[in-house]
């Protein structure tokens, strides 16, 4: 169990999870606001 925790906390695994979630977030934003240069929820 300790080896699995050590493996999951290594940089390539964390980077894969981070970039995967970031890509998913960007895909979902582009699905709801296609071709948006300015996003409505960022305008103040």
From Swiss-Prot:
Instruction: Give the family, as the similarity comment puts it.
Output: Belongs to the PsaJ family.
Q: How does it sit in the membrane?
A: Single-pass membrane protein
Protein source organism:
Cycas taitungensis (Prince sago)
GO CC list? chloroplast thylakoid membrane; photosystem I
Write down the superkingdom of origin.
Eukaryota
The portions of this protein that span the membrane are: 7-27
**Entry annotated with the keyword Repeat:** no
Q: What is its main location?
A: plastid
GO BP term, example: photosynthesis
The protein, known as: Photosystem I reaction center subunit IX
């Amino acid at each position: 169990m300790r080896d699995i925790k050590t493996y999951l906390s290594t940089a390539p695994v964390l980077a894969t999870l981070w970039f995967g979630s970031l890509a998913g977030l960007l895909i979902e934003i582009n699905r709801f606001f296609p071709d948006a240069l300015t996003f409505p929820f960022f305008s103040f």
